[in-house]
C-alpha cells in the first residue's frame, strides 16, 4: 500500500491552513497548529489501521516532515 502523505499548507485567497491528502482538501483552519494537530491525529489513526502515514508542513517554498 502506498504511504498516506498528509500535507499541511496555506490555500486560497485568504491563505487559510488546510490539510490535504492527495487531491482531497480538509478543513479551513485559523492557524497552523490546529491543522497540524488534525493531520497528526489522522496519521496516527491510519497507522493504527496498519497503513504507513506521514505529515508534511509546506510553508512558502519549504517543506518539512513533521510525523
Briefly describe each language-model feature range.
Residues 47-67:
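Short, mixed-charge low-complexity intrinsically disordered segments
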Residues 1-3, 33-41:
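Charged, amphipathic alpha-helical segments
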Residues 2-25:
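Short aromatic-glycine-(Arg/Gly/Cys) micro-motifs in beta-strand/loop hairpins
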Residues 43-45:
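Short, solvent-exposed helix-to-loop capping segments enriched in aromatics
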Residues 18, 29, 65-67:
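Short acidic, gly/pro-rich beta-turn/loop elements at beta-sheet edges
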Residues 21-36:
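A short, exposed loop/beta-hairpin motif centered on an aromatic-Gly-Thr core
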Residues 24, 39-40, 60:
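Low-complexity, intrinsically disordered/propeptide-like segments
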Amino acid at each position: 500500500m502506498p504511504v498516506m502523505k498528509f500535507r499541511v499548507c496555506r490555500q486560497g485567497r485568504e491563505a487559510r491552513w488546510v490539510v490535504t491528502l492527495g487531491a482531497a482538501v480538509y478543513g479551513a483552519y485559523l492557524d497552523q497548529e490546529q491543522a497540524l494537530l488534525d493531520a497528526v491525529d489522522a496519521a496516527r489513526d491510519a497507522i493504527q489501521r496498519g497503513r504507513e502515514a506521514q505529515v508534511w508542513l509546506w510553508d512558502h517554498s519549504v517543506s518539512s516532515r513533521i510525523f
